[in-house]
Amino acid sequence: MRKSFYFPVLLLLALAANANSQTSGVPAAEWKRLASPEQAGWSGKKLAGIRDYLEEIGSTSAMIVQHGVVVAAWGDVAHKSNLHSCRKSLLNSLIGIAVADGKINLDETLEKLGIDDKKPSLTDVEKQATVRDLLEARSGVYHAAAYETKGMAEERPQRGSHAPGTFWYYNNWDFNTLGHIYETATGTKIFDAFYREIAQPIGMQDFTPRDGHYVTSPDSLYPAYLFDISARDFARFALLYLHDGKWNDTQVVPEDWVKASTRPYSDAESGGYGYLWWTGDSASGEPQRISFPKGSFWAEGHLGQYAVVVPSLDLIVVNRVDGDMTKRTVHKRQVARLVEMVVAAAPGN
């Protein structure tokens, strides 16, 4: 029998609340959902094709949001599961607030901050990496890290092979150390801070501080910080960045920080990399192997966790894969195809 996505009845009723073309751009306590995507200009046939494609590739839930309203949703979007590496984009928001508050200086070095690690400890050269270098994944510190897969460990460059700031390598050591720097600078645990500074102001419906946990390693001092978040809360976070950090009349994350974070500083196979966000544009301007819409940016995590923001269309595409529900992985090229299909189904295309 053909598998189908399901929706809890109460959630469906909530999402199906009347949603007209005139909206505030952000959801209130509940998401609004288009009563008829076709009447709003969306292709019903192409949306059905997207549903079939999601089942084909193994997504466990997904959402399309335009103008702050749910166009379509599949799966249990209230179910919380591991965001994996999307955690880094979440941390970005907290660091941006701390920078604006004067608690973190992007140009401070690891040496100045007293950062070292287990033996073999950091060299004097490695300690010259700055907070900015870590945000860009250009620290040049290739120490073992918590929550590092076997493949990541095998691909890690040799220690001392690149000076700080000169080479991009997607590096869990950088990201985990940023978490430590944030907690030390603010005196607040990441999950408590995220709940207070982000989740509550933007009305996340499901997240609590208990939905975060740390993963440690015998090889490094700095733990990974993992978030279990629902698809609908993840979509709210993406919408916050689509709106340059503003939610209704409140500037939750500084606008200049959002803009700095979502521009490319390095090239990657699908475009570029900013401050803990992936970008559809490359830093060099050269086309890359996997194509996302121009000007887009996204959070990305293991197994197929994505929140893709397409500012030119006021559009968000969320894809989730719960590893407790399936053994499948949705790959980046498949997500690029998903976004392409969504854009093709949108009004005017």
What role is predicted for each listed range?
Residues 25-35, 45-49, 87, 96-170:
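Active-site-proximal loop and beta-strand segments within enzyme catalytic domains
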Residues 100-137, 186-224, 229:
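Active-site helix/loop module of the DD-peptidase/beta-lactamase fold
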Residues 299-349:
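Structured C-terminal helix/loop/strand segments within mature extracytoplasmic catalytic/sensor domains
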